[in-house]
Design a protein with these regions (language model features):
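C-terminal catalytic "cap/lid" subdomain
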Residues: 1-195
Length: 195
């Protein structure tokens, strides 16, 4: 499955004490943070949702499930098929797309603090996007660690399912689903799901 191989460095794991010397840890800190209390950790894409059966049961019972916040807890299987936690960060947007795909959802909503995705964000040429295809979005540039992961997640979901994705403000969730607000992302009319 795409996204299961390799890792990229992202974020910081904040420790309660100074980073021990000699462990080979890379150090990184956001602006204003103490470098001796942070270290770089890898960011990975989830390969599977371990609790999928439980989530399917809840959804089929009519329960509104809010999950994969923060991306989930990164674990690996050892040679005895036991799960162990690893020091990594799982991308929450890609995890949401994976879960929506595995649940065979019709739509993926990514709720954020802005009303729309903007082409050219932060420039005088910035313009809100309302209806756009995954292919059109892939031709644009977005800020890494901000809108780019949401765009990638939306595109992966759409390419896998043929469903729709929407990105916009939390308060606009029902309108996002109807296509009345936010950025609605669809598959190109010539692309079948899974293509």
């Amino acid at each position: 499955m795409r996204g299961c191989k390799g890792a990229r460095g992202v974020g910081c794991g904040h420790l309660g004490a100074d980073v021990p010397a000699g462990r080979g840890w890379a150090r990184a800190a956001p602006a204003g943070a103490r470098l001796d209390r942070a270290r770089a950790i890898i960011g990975v894409s989830a390969c599977t949702i371990i609790e999928l059966a439980a989530l399917e049961l809840l959804v089929s019972s009519g329960v509104l499930v809010v999950c994969v916040g923060g991306g989930g807890i990164p674990v690996v299987l050892d040679q005895h098929q036991r799960l162990h936690g690893i020091e990594a960060v799982i991308d929450k947007d890609l995890s949401a797309a994976l879960l929506a795909t595995q649940l065979d959802a019709d739509a993926l909503l990514m709720l954020t603090d802005v009303p729309n995705v903007e082409a050219g964000w932060g420039t005088p040429q910035a313009r809100p996007l309302t209806d756009v295809t995954a292919d059109e979005l892939r031709m644009l540039k977005f800020a890494p660690g901000s809108m780019a992961p949401k765009i990638e997640a939306a595109c992966r979901f759409i390419e896998a399912t043929g469903g729709i994705a929407a990105i916009g403000a939390l308060a606009d969730a029902p309108a996002l689903l109807r296509g009345d607000r936010g950025t609605r992302i669809t598959a190109p009319t010539s692309s079948p799901p899974g293509a």
